[in-house]
Amino acid sequence: MATEFTRNFSIIAHIDHGKTTLSDRLLEETQTISQREKQDQLLDAMDLEREKGITIKSHPVAMEYKAKDGNTYRLNLLDTPGHVDFSYEVARSLAACEGAILMIDAAQGVEAQTMANLHLAMDQKLVIIPVLNKIDLPAADVDRCKQQLEDILAIPAEDAIPASAKNGIGIEDILEAIIERVPAPVEHEDKLLRASVFDSVYDTFRGVVSYVRVFSGSIHKGQRIRLFHTNKTYEVKECGVFTPKMTKRDELIAGDVGYFIANMKSADEAKIGDTVTDSTHPCPEELPGYKEIQPMVFSGIYPVDTSDYEALKTAMAKLQINDAAFTFQSESSTALGFGFRCGFLGLLHMEIIQERLRREFNMDVISTYPSVIYQVTKTNGEELIVDNPAMLPDAQVIEEIREPMVKLFIMIPGDYIGDIMALVMEKRGDVTHTETVDPTRVLLTAEVPLSEILVDFNDRMKSMTRGYGSMDYEHCGYRPAKMVKMDMLIAGEPVEAFSTIVHREKAESYGRALAVRLKDVIPQQLFVVAIQACIGGNIIASERISAMRKNVTAKCYGGDISRKRKLLEKQKKGKEKMKAFGKVNIPQDAFIKVLKSGD
């Protein structure tokens, strides 16, 4: 099909605003799928995606549509993940498009995630088609949404298309708007092969399947291709398009969105954002926008049953083949045995990996407290990247520690603004901007350390706003902070599973809370056990577990007080000796209880 009859577009939306439902309706309207194949959330292939109602991997699909002008067009839809953890995948998918449908729930209005993803689309200079979804709901307020479009997003209200994806209202208007407003792809004059990899999946039988958008030239079976960043060459074994199943084609031409298979063994060989070109007639420069994906959040993952270590390693390797952003390396802990230090794009990514380990591989795992990457400058000028408390040097040789910051967009009902501002300040953040979205809602912009939003920020924000708040974030660099390494000592012995890097001002309250939790789960010993939180050599919080009392005078009949005193003195000496040489054996389930209650 000629390039002028091709349209590439994406759908961006906040979670639950109906993005995947709209995709389903478009597939039905264009008769891409038959009635027999119909099922809700068709493009969300993973059970986890259907269950959580989110899109985790990109899902492209080619549709053919006969427009009112009498021409048949090929519409390539790239269904992208909506969550910030996958923003690089979203950016690469958007770069493969010329237009984007911006979905807004007419009952909810503009949400925090809408803003973040719209910024990504505008960075790529895409044509934006606003769609007001769910107009059939009693709570829908179309006029208010149109006002928000103009006030917050600076998009003309008359451009908005009212629709209901669930009931099929406005679907034809959306298809016509794609053809009229989204420009056709433009091919480079030299017609050399340039294609961008925007995703890849691993197939057990065929190896890596790379998803590509062809910008110029063509890809066909038997062709020798080269990838810019690995500089490796491959022979194309198969290429085709998604309908939504993989359908073989003789070639992919400029403007096409499709896939190719070329004997790649892992997702690391087909990096997202890499440029594909012909090995004999390569293009002179790569397509812009490529960057290495860096994990932002780290956590130790250990098997609950230590004999599952090899099975866990195999499971992680299989997940990594499909997910190049997930990293892991072996580590061991005296408390938890052998496990892995894992890197994730963010909290949702971490949750998804853990859930997939449990579901797809039946692995029972425990994860340590999540940490972030710190930049450390030593007094001798040496720069370090620290993602594990054990790697942090002694305080005496540290010149400066810098922590990662995030820009938070929080959309809340105006009544709760005071509570949320207090929460941001409690988390060491600064509110940089407030904007009234409509008479009832406010958009807060704040800068907060990434480590502070890792665990409970979203949950607390949701409960404070009775579930009406929404948030999204983007990374915004590093800033200096007074971070310290806090160790937990149990009977004088440091336990590395509980070591953490915390802010100096929060160390005492965190240490005290952890000591209390440990006191509740560690069984009593025959001697007094001290649980201490310490920074360097200074103890900042302490709890004690009293000794079990054994009645050594029980066998003394009669009233000989000197005999009883002798036995009690002997017991006292024995306890002191035990305290000096005794080791506290902490059962593994105690660690698991503490780590899980700390989630």
Predicted features and spans:
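Structural and coupling elements of P-loop NTPases
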Residues: 1-599
